[in-house]
Amino acid sequence: NMLVSDYFHKEFHVPYDSIAVIAGPCHAEEIALERLSYLTVGCSSIDHAKQFAKKLGNSFIKTSVSDDVVGIEYGSVLKNIYAIAAGICSGLKYGDNFQAVLMSNAAIEMNRFLNVVHPIERTINDSVYMGDLLVTGYSKFSRNRVFGSMIGKGYSVKNAQIEMEMIAEGYYAAKCIKEINEHYRINTPIIDAVYNILYEGISPVIEIKLLTDSFK
């Protein structure tokens, strides 16, 4: 349960200002098609972030920089869990209206989590957080959404993983974040619901119904 930046720093003694992360609404499938996409480069050294961003940018990839490495890393993990939740709801035949409510509450929950584990000033509506959350939750290219949809349709976790032949990172992320949150005790009902469905074997129908009663 260690962030990638922390792992490289602790295990290989790489200075934090030499570690950069990239995130944003940027599916590889659309990059291959040269469709306009946006990336944020996160590094504790903004100068280094700008250097990396300059090398990554081109006519169809717009780049920006941030020093919120921890927030970006956690956001990139959390959005996969929320995408599984979105997929589960889709598999259960909830419509677009509820999907919008789910993602709105996911953004609130993500912001709450980030503000506790790494309390700095950030704008959750920036594309590196909100944009990545939305594209992962809605896109047909999202492995995590597809995985969640299969769970919502009644597949077991094992059968969904076998049939997908791809890794849905959110499955593993749900367990990691659940364990991390044992220390922080943050209110994360969506993450808890996904964890209960995937690891405790609780019915998706029951867990999502509980969420519908708590959302605004």
Regions found by a protein language model. Give the residues of each.
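Short beta-strand and adjoining strand-loop segment in the mid-core
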Residues: A32-K50, A86-V101
